Amino acid sequence: MVRGQYKKGNDERMRFPKKNKPQKFENYAWVLDYLPYGYPDKPDEPIVQGLGEYQFLLMEMIPKPNVDIELGERVYIGKGKRDKIDHVRRMIKYEQLTPTAKSELLYVVMEAVKIQEDRFVRFFNECPPITTRLHTLELLPEIKKKYMWKIIEEREAKKFESFKDFEERIGKNPVRIIAKRIEKELSDDKKDKYYLFVKWKKGIILNEDNMTFYLKE
């Protein structure tokens, strides 16, 4: 891509196909907070606040009796035998997270990103322009125009092979960049119309399968 090429034209409001893409089932979640006696203002059975590993769903889970739960722990919530989680009780919003869960969120997201390295390296290699004047990369923290063009030029010369390769060639920590974007998408309720990784909100969503955008209403 030549610098400035994707900016040609004056149509900033491209039309996105409307689509309600089925959500993928979460197999793993990460523990954000563990409340052995329920919420302080409403004592109840033990509650775990967690984050889905792939779709980054915020959820409330009920642990099995007499199990040890640690902050930042990865727990299985898929089909079949579960070691620590009895069931997922409900989905929750960012505002419903405890102060502890909010403080743990970025660090937990970073761990989830690290073990999905292939997914996010592919994102850096293939993410497209959104409109004639805006590229997906510009939505990432710390990137902006300067690093956007550096990433585009580097990936055209040779695809990124790993997080380490990206950091050595770009000079930025890719795990933190992705994690901060996910944290922003989770916390900015109705303030952000583009969602790259949090698929369950309404807005313009990136379909990572084919790297195109669709409108979810």
Curated annotation (Swiss-Prot):
Gene3D superfamilies in alphabetical order: AF1531-like domain, Nucleic acid-binding proteins
Coiled coil regions, renumbered to chain: none
Pfam families linked to this entry: DUF655
Superkingdom as given in the UniProt entry: Archaea
Signal peptide feature range: none
Entry-linked InterPro entries: DUF655 (IPR007003), NA-bd_OB-fold (IPR012340)
PANTHER family: DNA-BINDING PROTEIN (PTHR40734:SF1), TRNA-SPECIFIC ADENOSINE DEAMINASE-RELATED (PTHR40734)
Name used for this protein in its record: Uncharacterized protein MJ0038
